[in-house]
């Protein structure tokens, strides 16, 4: 098996499209580093000139005077250096940010395209929150790390290199002292980071647990109150926050040692430089200006070492996030099959021919399943949890492919058809009525973008939802969102029925469409359903058997097998599983009525 490339190597594949901006940002950062490093040296020139001549003037040396022109020239150079430093710093960040944000946009677009191509089975195997995190926080972690770390690495490498060159140029003895402090400083910083890293990781884990606990308790707040679990919930919350406080303290205490340790090493280096430098100044082997330059270089050398040490954790976090992003991008696409287009509209003739299916190898769920459905028929599917009801629909929609056998629609093996053309023949009304942010009109038009306003109103009337829409502020132009509290679940289901009517599909999937609504809305939904199912092949999954009594065929499933089949009356006469289920629900209604 070919070994996968490093995540950072693959990241360059995204960034190289903006390589000129990156190169320009790097050059500007190098310019700012050069301007920063030469600052002590330029100041040293002015200080040397001033101190030397002031000393001679104080001694009364004949002709001693300050070369004002030279000092003025040095100050002009110093100010010009400052302007170049600021411009280099600002525009290096500007161009790097532009390149990184453009790259991140490309990465998110690739993720979005990938999500539309991967099979539905991926979503069954991964939590929604985890996938959302890969789109948002993981990509953002990569963005922040790259934007900050890249220029910090450039800054650290060139600062260290130039400072080493400058101290060796100014004075070999003092230069060697400064250079000797570098590995000591780096080792100290690395040791502290290594000790604190496990606590920071644990802190992140505990913080994640705290977020999950809060989210869980807020979403189940009513249940929490109902069972009087506030005190135990509060105690658990205190335990988590206590752990967070403990690991947070340890992480910050150890990492807080960074600056004292680095400052101690700097102080020691400074002391050696000051003592030996003073001796050399008195001996005339070192100027006062160069002496002050050395002092500044001692302080200047600490920051890049500290940055490089801290970047290790940042880059590790970025790599973890990159790995998670590329895990999604590396997922195999849906198998396209022969991708034949549909030249004619389907009539809705559906056949399951000796179909086998299994989610997990050697654990068959559906075995030798056979079914013939004529155009326009209503087929109801009932059975206990895990019987295979939803799996049948997933196979029909080709969210999964059959293990053996074939499913045909109008004689076409669905594996040979274009998924896009094939799925356009379907309409769905689910218990969890999905509506996206936008106007009601935009939501209804979702399945038929060419629909006119008149067609939208006609579909809404057929779905018994037109009157309700007109009572809303803005009517058909009212903005919908996840917090649309003035629209009940049943009303949302009516809207999805109108949407399905407008799409005019040949085959319908109705999954628990009338569960969890009041009686009045259930009647409206049932009437809307009848309008929707006219002339269309319909597959209905429902627990409330009162909604499927008019079905042409009722399939009773158990462990992926049809154990009973017929219409409502014939299945009651047979007094099998369906009869027991129906009588159980009927008896419950009788008890409630009493």
Predicted regions and their residues:
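A short amphipathic helical element positioned immediately N-terminal to and/or at the very start
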Residues: 4-19, 131
